[in-house]
Each structure stands twice: as C-alpha cells, then as structure tokens.
C-alpha cells in the first residue's frame, strides 16, 4: 500500500525476576506483514530469574545459555521498531518488559480493537484473549502447546488479525491504519 508506514508485529515472553517475580523480558519475536521472522531471540533479563513461567512463556533454563543480554537485545529491538506501526496484543506489557515508553510509537493493539471484537461476536466482553480472537477470526488454535507459548506464533496471529481489521475498515469505509502522518 503506497504511502504507508511499514508494519511489524511484536510479541514478548517474560519470566519472573527476584523475590516478587516481577516480569523480565526473556524472548522477543518480530515478524513482518507476511509473517516472516525479522527478530527472534532469547534474552537474558537483568536480575535473578526466580520463575521461568515455562508453561506460559516456553522459556527454560537452557534457553538462557548464550542468550542475548537485555541491554543489547533492547537496542536491537527498538531499532527495528523505529518509525514503524507496531502490532501486538496487550502491547503495554511488552513495552514495559522492554523498559520503553510506548507513547513514542504508533501502535495497533488487538486487545483494544472493538471493531475486531464485534467481528468475532465478542463485543460484550471486558477483555478478549489473543487465543480466542485467533480461534474466532483466524480459525486457528494457538497457545495450546504443553511447552508454552511461541512468541513467533503469537506475533504472526496479531499480524493476521491486524490485516483482518484493515479489511473490515476498508469494507465499512472507515479510515485504514498505518497511513503516514
């Protein structure tokens, strides 16, 4: 689409740090509009990992062997996000894990797109999970591995949902997202 900003989908997986198990970034994946992986690394967070959250995060102690240090990964990721429309689900958590203020970015968040929720017949809900949106609109079952979530799979799902939202907007004559300012 000519005159449009480049779009990238992001998903992060977190582990618990310290005695209070505060979230720390342990994996980040970025995909382009076609679902091709632009970035996918395990990241060594700052602080002591006290809970790998493996059932959800998919991260194990073995993944931390040779993992990219947080400070290095953060710079790599932010460089890839710069100037792009960032797509994701509940992105505030991903940006918090990156220790980055998301107000400086243009974002599209599937967790707040009521138009998408209506299309999935979920507009009565207070919150909608990525898993449910994917089942309803993509007819795909995600996040069902016993090994935890895949941030690549989740990023691809949010990108596909973004594309559905764009088609709904076009069909209804609503402004499309990602148009350059």
UniProtKB/Swiss-Prot annotation:
Its EC number is 3.1.13.1. Mn(2+) 2 binds at residues 90, 93. Highly expressed in peripheral blood leukocytes, spleen, thymus, colon and lung. Up regulated by E2 in estrogen receptor-positive breast cancer lines. SMART domains: EXOIII. This is Interferon-stimulated gene 20 kDa protein. Optimum pH is 7.0. Binds 2 manganese ions per subunit. It catalyses: Exonucleolytic cleavage in the 3'- to 5'-direction to yield nucleoside 5'-phosphates. Associates with PML and SP100 in the PML NB complex. Associates with survival motor neuron protein (SMN)-containing macromolecular nuclear complexes and U1 and U2 snRNAs and U3 snoRNA. GO terms for biological process: defense response to virus; DNA catabolic process; innate immune response; negative regulation of viral genome replication; response to virus; RNA catabolic process; RNA processing; rRNA processing. It comes from the Eukaryota. Its cofactor is Mn(2+). The gene is ISG20. Mn(2+) 1 binds at residues 11, 13, 154. It is found in: Nucleus; Nucleus, Nucleolus; Cytoplasm; Nucleus, Cajal body. It is an enzyme of class 3 (hydrolase).
């Amino acid at each position: 689409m000519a005159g449009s900003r480049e779009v990238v989908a992001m998903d992060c997986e977190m582990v618990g740090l310290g005695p209070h198990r505060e979230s720390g970034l342990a994996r980040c994946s970025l995909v382009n509009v076609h679902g091709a992986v632009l970035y996918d690394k395990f990241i060594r967070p700052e602080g002591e990992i006290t809970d790998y959250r493996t059932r959800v995060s998919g991260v194990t102690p073995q993944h931390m062997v040779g993992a990219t240090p947080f400070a290095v990964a953060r710079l790599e990721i932010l460089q890839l996000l710069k100037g792009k429309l960032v797509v994701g689900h509940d992105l505030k958590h991903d940006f918090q894990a990156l220790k980055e203020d998301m107000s400086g970015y243009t974002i599209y968040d599937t967790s707040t797109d009521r138009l998408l929720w209506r299309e999935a017949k979920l507009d009565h809900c207070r919150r909608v999970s990525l898993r449910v949106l994917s089942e309803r609109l993509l007819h795909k079952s995600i996040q069902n591995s016993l090994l935890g979530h895949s941030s690549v799979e989740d990023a691809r799902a949010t990108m596909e949902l973004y594309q559905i939202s764009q088609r709904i907007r076009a069909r209804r004559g609503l402004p499309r997202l990602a148009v350059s300012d």
